[in-house]
Amino acid sequence: MKKILLTGLAALFLLAGWFLAGRDERPAPALPDDPLEIGVEADVEPFSYVGLRGELTGFDVEFAREVCRELHRECRIEPMAFAALLPSLKAGELDLVVAGLAETKKRRVDFLFSEPYYRSGSFFVTTQKRFEHFTPDRIPELVIGVQEGKLQDEYVAEHYVPRGARKKTYSSFDALVDALLSGEVNMIFLDSVPGYTLLNHPRGEALFIGGRAENDDAEFTACRVAAKRGDVPLIEGVNRTLHKLQSNGKFQDLIIRFLPFFSF
């Protein structure tokens, strides 16, 4: 069954590649020759982290490098706290942010977004078995940790704090996990891709999934690259890179190499 599914996926990717290749026959717009300054989130596996040989790697990092290759520009990849990424892009310190961003009405005021390059839901993780399947009446017992500036931060503030939960924010993924393991919070709410990576890591041996977001709609799960509003040629270059990688199989290679599951 798995072999049939993967073969079917490969066929779909190939057909998509033929379609997209035809769509992209028009000449690409001229782009500057200076280096591309690309922001990624620091220290969050499997997206951006320091490998065993001391090199910066990860799904977002390698996708960013492919964008630079497609646009024939030198790459300067800047790992930073997630909450600093969009302000740095808005200030002109970055050209792109490759960090699995959701496109929201608020963000569209200042930024332009690519097509989704992967999809990911969100779930709660806990150390306490009693919260593994919590019900709405237990929400006032929750102290929920979230990462500052992420969509999960906004979601908890909107859906759980008004119902009695307490929210604590942390500047990094590691700080968020440390807060859960130390008992500072009894639940964290995070992206499912690094969440599954955590659960398969020795640090996650005593952790449980404590439920999913109540509303995993398309806006909440589609993950995109961002540029400054108006930078259409650059976003078109990102989309062109995505189409090319999907059609030649390299994107699937990146998924198999870094992600715990197919995520489209």
Mark where each language-model region is:
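Ligand-binding clefts/hinges and TM-proximal coupling segments of bilobed small-molecule sensing domains
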Residues: L15-G22, L151-Y170, A206-G210, N239-F264
